[in-house]
A protein has these predicted regions:
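A short aromatic-anchored loop/beta-hairpin motif
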Residues: 1-87
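Generic structural hydrophobic/aromatic packing signal, biased to beta-strands
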Residues: 7-9, 69, 98, 110, ...
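Acidic, glycine-rich active-site loops and adjacent beta-strand->loop/helix elements
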Residues: 13, 56, 115-117, 145
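A generic secondary-structure signal
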Residues: 36-40, 101, 127-128
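Hydrophobic beta-strand segments of well-ordered beta-sheets in folded domains
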Residues: 46-51, 106-110, 136-138
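Cap/lid and interdomain-hinge subdomains that line or gate substrate/regulatory clefts
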Residues: 79-125
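Active-site beta-strand/loop microenvironment that shapes enzyme catalytic pockets
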Residues: 121-157
C-alpha cells in the first residue's frame, strides 16, 4: 500500500495559457516542466491516482467532480464529467487541467487539504491516501514561494 509515484507541480492560474494572455510565452518552460513531471507520473503502474492540493478545508472530491476557471476570467471546465456546479478549488482544477493536457488519466479522486492543516493531520491524510490501494500515485499541487531570490518580493526577509 505504498505511494510508488509522485509529482509536484505549481498551481497558479497563469499556467493555463488562456489565463496568462500576454505572459503565456513566459510560462512555457514552467508548463514544459509540469508536462514532464506529469508524463513521468503517468508511466507508473498504479492502482490509484489522486490529485492533492490546498483547499478551504480538508475534503475528498470524487473523480467525477469538475472545476472551472471562470472566477479567473476563463469559462473553461476541467475535471470529471459531473455536470453539476464546478466545485474543485483552484489547486485541484489546475491539476485536472494538467492531466487533461497530458491526454487525460484515470484518477481515483481529488483531495483538498486545508491550508492550516498541521503536520500530524497531513501525515494522517497521507497514510489514508497511501492505504487506498496497493500502488498509489499522487499529483501534489502547491504554491511556489515568492522568496526565490534577492529581487523577489520579500527576498531580503
Amino acid at each position: 500500500m505504498p505511494v510508488v509515484a509522485a509529482a509536484v507541480c505549481p498551481h497558479p492560474p497563469a499556467i493555463v495559457p488562456q489565463l496568462a494572455q500576454g505572459a503565456a510565452g513566459e510560462l512555457d518552460a514552467l508548463r514544459a516542466a509540469a508536462d514532464d513531471a506529469i508524463a513521468a507520473l503517468l508511466t507508473a503502474q498504479v492502482d490509484a491516482r489522486f490529485v492533492v492540493g490546498p483547499a478551504a478545508s480538508t475534503v475528498r472530491f470524487a473523480a467525477s467532480t469538475g472545476g472551472c476557471f471562470a472566477p479567473w476570467g476563463l469559462p473553461l471546465r476541467v475535471g470529471g464529467p459531473d455536470q453539476g456546479p464546478p466545485v474543485l478549488p483552484l489547486s485541484l482544477a489546475v491539476g485536472a487541467w494538467l492531466l487533461e493536457r497530458a491526454g487525460g488519466a484515470e484518477i481515483t479522486g481529488y483531495q483538498g487539504v486545508a491550508a492550516d492543516a498541521g503536520p500530524a493531520a497531513c501525515a494522517a491524510l497521507g497514510a489514508t491516501l497511501a492505504a487506498a490501494a496497493d500502488r498509489v500515485a499522487l499529483l501534489v499541487m502547491g504554491d511556489g514561494s515568492a522568496r526565490c531570490g534577492a529581487r523577489s518580493p520579500g527576498g531580503d526577509d
